[in-house]
Amino acid sequence: MVEPVIEIEVVYAAVDRQVLRVISVAEGTTVRAALMASGIDAEFPELDLISCPLGIFGKVIADPDARRVQEGDRIEIYRPLLADPKEVRRLRAAKAAEAKARNQ
């Protein structure tokens, strides 16, 4: 018997470009297995597909090795943050306070 096949998308936004791949996988495939089947690692060898954070439609997946993909899912590969948002806000506030003090 032939397993039903579903179509999903795999997306990654690198610093310099974005890639969206539409692939077909067997129904019941896990998120991690679908990601590996996409072949995106050949285009971005710096990606560690085993441990990189993943999401579907903006929602982080806690266990991509257990979560099954569904028809039409968009698997998103997340990059690490370049700067801690809290630290950036703190620096911005300090800079604004310094500018305000100079103007008084």
Swiss-Prot record:
Source organism superkingdom: Bacteria
Stored Gene3D superfamilies: RnfH-like
InterPro entries xrefs: Mopterin_synth/thiamin_S_b, RnfH, RnfH_sf
Short name of one Pfam family: Ub-RnfH
Family as reported in the entry's similarity comment: Belongs to the UPF0125 (RnfH) family.
Xref: PANTHER family: UPF0125 PROTEIN RATB
The protein, known as: Protein RnfH
Organism, scientific name: Pseudomonas fluorescens (strain Pf0-1)
